[in-house]
Amino acid sequence: MEKIPMTGAGFVALEEELRFRQQVERPRIISAISEARAHGDLSENAEYHAAKELQSLNEGRIAELEDKISRAEVIDVSKLSGDIVKFGATVTLVDEDTEEERVWQIVGDSEADAKAGRISISSPVARALIGKKKGSSVEVVTPKGARSFEIVEVRWA
C-alpha cells in the first residue's frame, strides 16, 4: 500500500470531511430516501432516484477518504529545516523574466490549492523545485510554457 504524504492540516481536513459525510450527510440522505419512498411508486419517483444517486456519491467519497486516511503519512513540517526544498517547504520564487515574486508551499495532492498558495508535490513546479537550494535557478515547464525562477527563500511553517 503506497503511503500518501500530507501535512497535519491536510490530514485534519480529511478527517473533518469524513466525519461530516458520515455523521451529517449520510443521515440526511437516508432521511431523504425514506421521505421519497413514502411518495409511492419508485419507478417514476425522481426524488427517490436523486437521493439514491446522492447516497452513492457520498458513500464513494467516504470510501475514498477512508482509504486516504489509512494510507496517510503525516509529515510535521515544523520539525523540518534547512535550505533545500522538500515536501512541506514554503518557497519564495522570483520569476527571472518578469521579476514577479511567488510563494508556494509544497503539500500533498489532496491538499493542493494554487489560489491559496499550496501546490501538489506531483505538480511540475514542485517536481522542479524538490532538491534545489536557496539561490538556485530552476526551469519549470508548465502548460503555459517554460519559465525560469530563482529560489530566494525556503522556510518551514
UniProtKB/Swiss-Prot annotation:
UniProt cross-references to InterPro entries, sorted A to Z: GreA/GreB_C_sf, TF_GreA/GreB_CS, Tscrpt_elong_fac_GreA, Tscrpt_elong_fac_GreA/B, Tscrpt_elong_fac_GreA/B_C, Tscrpt_elong_fac_GreA/B_fam, Tscrpt_elong_fac_GreA/B_N, Tscrpt_elong_fac_GreA/B_N_sf
Keyword DNA-binding: yes
PROSITE patterns (UniProt xref): GREAB_1
A single GO molecular function term of this UniProt record: DNA binding
Keywords: DNA-binding, Transcription, Transcription regulation
GO BP term, pick one: regulation of DNA-templated transcription elongation
Transferase in keyword set: no
Superkingdom to which the source organism belongs: Bacteria
One of the Pfam families matching this protein, by short name: GreA_GreB_N
Family per record: Belongs to the GreA/GreB family.
Stated role: Necessary for efficient RNA polymerase transcription elongation past template-encoded arresting sites. The arresting sites in DNA have the property of trapping a certain fraction of elongating RNA polymerases that pass through, resulting in locked ternary complexes. Cleavage of the nascent transcript by cleavage factors such as GreA or GreB allows the resumption of elongation from the new 3'terminus. GreA releases sequences of 2 to 3 nucleotides.
Protein name (Swiss-Prot/TrEMBL): Transcription elongation factor GreA
